[in-house]
A protein has these predicted regions:
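Short active-site neighborhood of thiol/selenol oxidoreductases, capturing the structured segment around
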Residues: 192-220, 233-234
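Structural microenvironment flanking redox-active thiols in thiol-disulfide oxidoreductases
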Residues: 214-260, 276-281
């Protein structure tokens, strides 16, 4: 805990120095992001962090579109999102509201204001929502979307779109019980995911024609960490086109053979197809991209969400895995 506080304090000091130096050399143009200066009287680390977040955007000129082209805005936003990781949820939500109100509640009639809004909306999606972003954070993105969707300056279409994403991102969150569903296996039997409770489940949503699905599955198998009798891989085609799923028998069959040892022992694979494509049509799981991989523990809780093959291998080797929420 002391290490985290000290590290955060050092970052705040660095940001203060950058702000001071930047202000000394800034003439008519803003050449660096204008980080706020934290008053010396504030000694408590948490209060310094709260002040930094609350006043982070005070000196940034949201009307100057040249800052967008020179990447000054992007650097400032990246640092802001990084700083939010060290704050409590209340401070985070307050900071996000201040930020959103600054770029949304400007002169909406001007072309410059619209450019600024589009820029920050795009960057927030890129950093926090994009499937492969190292900064992806569902909880923070939901906080942001809730704020922007509640703005009176957000139109009806945008508001409905944001609320759709909010609703889906709040499904099957880390630590929560994974939503059960029915599927048909290769033998024609109707089964349920809950039937495997008591075992670790690698839930692998795939498409037979998806090259990335092939690659990710092979990486998981080559890692050998799934060679455990208490682990089951549920490879599920979430769509409604059963003819495409039937072609996938070759894909799954090849990978099963690769996973077996000389005694015929290996990973247990269950290959299934969503009944009527309900996983997609009813958004039972929010699948942004395929493959979409979850790890569900013996108690049926989600422990990794939308992870990579590398994350799966690391998890079952009991090595640290990237955190996707906070």
């Amino acid at each position: 805990m002391r290490y985290i506080v000290n590290k955060l304090f050092i970052k705040i000091v660095i940001l203060f120095c950058v702000a001071f130096i930047g202000s000394c050399f800034m003439l008519h143009a803003q050449d660096t992001f204008p980080y706020p200066a934290i008053p010396k009287e504030i000694k408590d680390a948490d209060k310094r962090l709260s002040f930094l977040i609350e006043h982070y955007w005070d000196r940034f000129d949201f009307a100057d579109t040249s800052l967008l082209k020179r990447n000054i805005a992007e650097q400032g936003l990246s640092d802001f999102l990084d700083i939010l990781k060290g704050a409590d949820s209340t401070t985070v939500n307050d900071g996000v509201k201040i930020f959103v109100n600054r770029f949304v509640c400007s002169d909406t009639a001007s072309t410059e204001a619209q450019l600024v809004k589009e820029y920050f909306v795009g960057k927030m999606e890129q950093y926090l929502y994009d499937y492969r972003s190292p900064m992806r954070n569902d909880a923070l993105y939901v906080s942001y979307l809730q704020t922007i969707s509640n703005s009176p300056l957000t139109d009806t279409f945008e508001r409905e779109h944001y609320r759709y994403i909010i609703n889906n991102l709040q499904k099957n969150r880390l630590g929560e019980t994974a939503t059960d569903f029915a599927f048909t296996d290769r033998g024609g039997r109707v089964r349920r995911m809950s039937g495997f409770k008591g075992r670790d489940i690698v839930l692998f949503f795939y498409d037979p024609d998806c090259h990335s699905c092939h690659s990710e599955m092979e990486q998981m198998i080559n890692g050998k960490s799934l060679l455990n009798s208490n682990i089951v891989v549920l490879a599920i085609y979430p769509g409604a086109e059963t003819d495409r799923w039937e072609r996938g028998d070759i894909f799954i069959g090849k990978n099963i053979q690769k996973s077996l040892n000389s005694k015929g022992e290996g990973i247990e694979f269950i290959d299934g197809c969503s009944i009527g494509g309900e996983i997609l049509s009813k958004d039972i799981y929010f699948i942004r991209e395929l493959p979409s991989v979850y790890i569900i523990d013996k108690d049926g809780r989600v422990v990794l969400k939308e992870c990579t093959a590398k994350d799966v291998v690391s998890y079952f080797q009991r090595s640290p895995c990237p955190a996707l929420d906070f």
